Structures are given as structure tokens and as C-alpha cells.
A protein has these predicted regions:
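Core catalytic alpha/beta fold that binds nucleotide/phospho-ligands
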Residues: 1-140
Length: 140
């Protein structure tokens, strides 16, 4: 396994919370139905949603592209039964990853009361159960 790309992104929670409150449709544009549903399980979903947004941005950086290269719904953060975050990558994002030689992903999410952060590593070969292949979700 070798690293194809690395992306890191951080989101300021107060700012993200204001954007979500000011623009009602933004959550629908940024997150899949499952991501939004996951957020509603918590009294304040801001940190968890912001970490998922950071992961989408970090995935773009890991692929060496910017906003507009693919839609936000084409990179989704799902949870393995263990709770481990996993990237599900589909559509144009999966095709771009395939062309870049990405065979799997590593993702780490964290948040405090002020900042959410994600680190995404695109790797050349997948390992079953620990990362998602470029066009799907890891099985565990």
C-alpha cells in the first residue's frame, strides 16, 4: 500500500453553525440523507456535521482537486459497526479516484467545542475492513 494523496481540513464550528442556521437548504446540499440523519441523533449536530464536511474537503485535497470537481454527495462519511468512519465514494469522485490510482481511503475525524477536523489519506491498495475502495464502502 502506498499513499496517493493526503488531505486535511478544519472547520470553525461557530461559523459553520451560523451558515447552517442562515441558509436552510445548505445541509441538504452538503450532506447525504444518511449523514443528516446521523447528525440528528445528537442534541447539537454541528461538530459531527462539520467533521463530515471537513472530510469531503480533505478528500478533494487528497485527490488534488478543488471545489466543483465533484459534488458533495459523491463523498459520504459512513460508520463501520465498530464506529470507525469510512468514506463511501461514488460517481465522478470515484472515477477521478480510480484514474489517480486510488484503491482505498483512510479517514480520521475529530472535533472540539470550537473546531472540527478531518484527515483523509488516499492509498493505492485497499485492505478489507479498514478502508473503502475508490468506488464503494469497505465491508467489515
Amino acid at each position: 500500500m502506498s499513499v496517493v494523496g493526503l488531505g486535511v481540513d478544519a472547520v470553525e464550528l461557530d461559523r459553520f453553525r451560523r451558515v447552517l442556521a442562515r441558509t436552510p437548504g445548505v445541509a441538504r446540499r452538503l450532506f447525504t440523507e444518511d449523514e443528516r440523519a446521523y447528525g440528528t441523533r445528537f442534541r447539537d449536530p454541528t461538530g459531527r456535521l462539520a467533521a463530515r464536511f471537513a472530510a469531503k474537503e480533505a478528500a478533494m485535497k487528497a485527490l488534488g482537486v478543488g471545489l466543483g470537481a465533484f459534488g458533495f454527495h459523491e463523498v459520504e462519511v459512513v460508520r463501520a459497526p465498530s464506529g470507525q468512519p469510512i468514506l463511501r465514494v461514488v460517481g465522478a469522485a470515484a472515477e477521478l479516484a480510480r484514474r489517480r490510482g486510488v484503491g482505498g481511503w483512510r479517514v480520521s475525524l475529530t472535533h472540539t467545542d470550537r473546531v472540527a477536523q478531518a484527515v483523509v489519506v488516499a492509498v493505492s491498495e485497499g485492505q478489507e475492513g479498514s478502508e473503502a475502495p475508490a468506488g464503494g464502502e469497505a465491508r467489515s
